[in-house]
Amino acid sequence: MSSDLKSRFLQVYDTLKSELINDPAFEFDDDSRQWVEKMLDYNVPGGKLNRGLSVIDSYQLLKGGELTDNEIFLAAALGWCIEWLQAYFLVLDDIMDESHTRRGQPCWFRLPKVGMIAANDGIILRNNVPRILKKHFRGKPYYVDLLDLFNEVEFQTASGQMIDLITTLVGEKDLSKYSLSIHRRIVQYKTAYYSFYLPVACALLMFGEDLEKHEEVKNVLVEMGTYFQVQDDYLDCFGAPEVIGKIGTDIEDFKCSWLVVKALELSNEEQKKILHENYGKKDPSSVAKVKELYHTLNLQGVFEDYENTSYKKLITSIEGHPSKAVQAVLKSFLGKIYKRQK
């Protein structure tokens, strides 16, 4: 991804933001316009923008040539719709998880003037997506498919978040509920569909493809999303906070993390007892005991094995795809995340 394309992508953000804060469906005054602008700037463009940029990347690989200015704009607008969706999830997620930082700064709801207004801001972020789609895609033959796609992926993500929340109910900390299959279900729905399938599906629709003919592409991307989340779980504990932009709290939050699931699988009775007694507790000594056990069980080595095996499996699946252009899209995705540090 050239820095030129990234700067063009960011220019499209400014255009979309300006359209949204001048949306004729609502009479903005100075206060509301300033609020929304500040809220958007704080929550939408601050991440790595991988999901959004991937739409342009994927479309370019499918087309196989130079993109027109209009194609770049439309692919970027779809990319920003995904970033908006992500911002909406994260703003509400941070409230539910009582998080403190996100992307190296305080969570939006932690700002003194924001608080629980953040819940409504999340709803506004979510409602910005169909406004953008309507303005720029209403005349396109794939408009209805786009709306269906965003609605379905949002439903899948919210349902994944639900399984995550009800499985990690802090009131009844029951580690025996945690297994690789539960972890996989949470990850698939909560992360893989919107982070991996959605950007490629947007590019395929824009390219005139029928998504029903690309089930195997969806399957590979969901596998990739699972691999990505396992990396995330690993980095939450073993990554450097200054590199990943947040302080990991999966242990304190009793998260159904790949690490704890693997630890349960590899532990003897004595070690299981340590997990049951310390996992999900806020005090630093409990967290330290869990981390120490992770080291004892060599979860770093177990993760490296997992990473290598997953990579080989994914490459094999990708190379089985009949279209070289689709292979290129999938390989470009995999290349971005393989052995990442943040």
UniProtKB/Swiss-Prot annotation:
One of its GO terms (molecular function) is metal ion binding. Mg(2+) 1 binds at D93, D97. It is an enzyme of class 2 (transferase). Keywords: Cholesterol biosynthesis, Cholesterol metabolism, Cytoplasm, Isoprene biosynthesis, Lipid biosynthesis, Lipid metabolism, Magnesium, Metal-binding, Steroid biosynthesis, Steroid metabolism, Sterol biosynthesis, Sterol metabolism, Transferase. Its cofactor is Mg(2+). SUPFAM superfamilies: Terpenoid synthases. Dimethylallyl diphosphate binds at R102, K190, T191, Q229, K246, K255. It catalyses: isopentenyl diphosphate + dimethylallyl diphosphate = (2E)-geranyl diphosphate + diphosphate; isopentenyl diphosphate + (2E)-geranyl diphosphate = (2E,6E)-farnesyl diphosphate + diphosphate. The keyword Lipid biosynthesis applies. GO terms for biological process: cholesterol biosynthetic process; farnesyl diphosphate biosynthetic process; geranyl diphosphate biosynthetic process. Mg(2+) 2 binds at D93, D97. InterPro entries: FPS1-like, Isoprenoid_synthase_dom_sf, Polyprenyl_synt, Polyprenyl_synt_CS. Its EC number is 2.5.1.10, 2.5.1.1. It is found in: Cytoplasm. Isopentenyl diphosphate binds at K48, R51, Q86, R103. GO terms for cellular component: cytoplasm. Binds 2 Mg(2+) ions per subunit. Pathway: Isoprenoid biosynthesis; farnesyl diphosphate biosynthesis; farnesyl diphosphate from geranyl diphosphate and isopentenyl diphosphate: step 1/1; Isoprenoid biosynthesis; geranyl diphosphate biosynthesis; geranyl diphosphate from dimethylallyl diphosphate and isopentenyl diphosphate: step 1/1. Catalyzes the sequential condensation of isopentenyl pyrophosphate with the allylic pyrophosphates, dimethylallyl pyrophosphate, and then with the resultant geranylpyrophosphate to the ultimate product farnesyl pyrophosphate. Belongs to the FPP/GGPP synthase family. This is Farnesyl pyrophosphate synthase 1. It comes from Parthenium argentatum (Guayule rubber plant). The lineage of its organism: Eukaryota, Viridiplantae, Streptophyta, Embryophyta, Tracheophyta. The gene is FPS1.
